[in-house]
């Protein structure tokens, strides 16, 4: 396994560099979608794209049981060196790269015996509307377990540790008023 991972490193590094150097903002991730589509097809994966929005899905295996791995594909629109531009400062370039690397590793190991893996490349996470679009597209209808990952720009866990959920949050609808300065979802503790 270690040997194969070492063999994958140049490919994964190249994927990351491309994605990092070509960020696209929410609902404009068409070149990102095209790049991922071509990459996956070259590796022998089947891909489902959508006529009315960016993003894509790839499935491996067959059966009723489905485990999904989701990544966001959009970049932030922010000031970089005095000018506003798309920028992968939130880590979505790394998220996409990790999912693509996972797909290559699972393909090599041929670990699937029953059921299927679904890989979801979701647009517009930063706008908060891409997940709903994937639901409307029925991407999650057959999913039994859905996993995602998010890098943290500020280290809250020691290297090598992981939290089973968002370390600082919860998935619950709240109603109320918040007074203060806003902050990015990946850095809520920096708001006031």
Describe the function of each predicted region.
Residues 57, 76-89, 94, 113-192:
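Histidine/acidic-residue-rich, glycine-tolerant segments that coordinate divalent metal ions
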Residues 2-89, 93-114:
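Acidic/His- and Gly-rich active-site-bordering loop/insert found
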């Amino acid at each position: 396994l270690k040997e194969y991972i070492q063999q994958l490193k140049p490919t994964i590094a190249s994927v990351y560099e491309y994605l990092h150097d070509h960020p696209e903002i929410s609902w404009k991730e068409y070149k990102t979608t095209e790049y991922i589509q071509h990459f996956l097809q070259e590796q022998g994966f089947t891909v489902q794209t959508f006529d009315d929005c960016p993003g894509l899905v790839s499935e491996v295996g067959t059966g009723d049981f489905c485990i999904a791995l989701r990544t966001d594909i959009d970049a932030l629109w922010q000031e970089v060196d005095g000018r506003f531009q798309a920028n992968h400062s939130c880590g979505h370039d790394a998220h996409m790269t990790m999912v693509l690397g996972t797909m290559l590793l699972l393909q090599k190991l041929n670990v699937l015996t029953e059921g299927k893996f679904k890989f979801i490349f979701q647009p517009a996470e930063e706008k908060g509307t891409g997940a709903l679009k994937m639901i409307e597209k029925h991407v999650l209808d057959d999913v039994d377990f859905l996993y995602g990952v998010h890098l943290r720009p500020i280290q809250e866990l020691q290297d090598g540790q992981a939290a089973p959920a968002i370390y600082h949050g919860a998935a619950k609808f709240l109603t109320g008023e918040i007074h203060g300065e806003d902050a990015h979802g990946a850095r809520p503790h920096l708001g006031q």
